[in-house]
Amino acid sequence: MKTVRFSTSGGRISAGVKVSAKREGSYELRLWERETNALVAGSPWYGHFLNNDTDDWQLPRPNADDDGRLLQCLVTLSLPPEVRSATVSLVIMQDGEEIGREAKDLPEGLEDYQLSLWVQLRKGA
């Protein structure tokens, strides 16, 4: 699991779900409490790649509370057989800068694909 370091005194942390090249699909973004099976209030967040709405989500404040929490992104994509592969990314931002990214490449030739991306948030940027 990738660890992403953030500043407790910086701006609000956000998580974005990206797919390149554009594909049909949806996702669920979960923010897990540190060392428990409980989700943070307000999580999960849902979205899909079929509209122009943003797929960026602001995490709750204060930032210090995010230390040790886990972000899990569950993605389902439909890939027509003639379409080339795609890359799905979970991008973590703070103060307008990318502070971390976890990504997976999807193999060619699959019609439907599910994947999970995990990131642990740690203070100390």
What are these regions, as identified by a protein language model?
Residues M1-S43, F49-L70, T76-A125:
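Beta-strand-rich recognition domains
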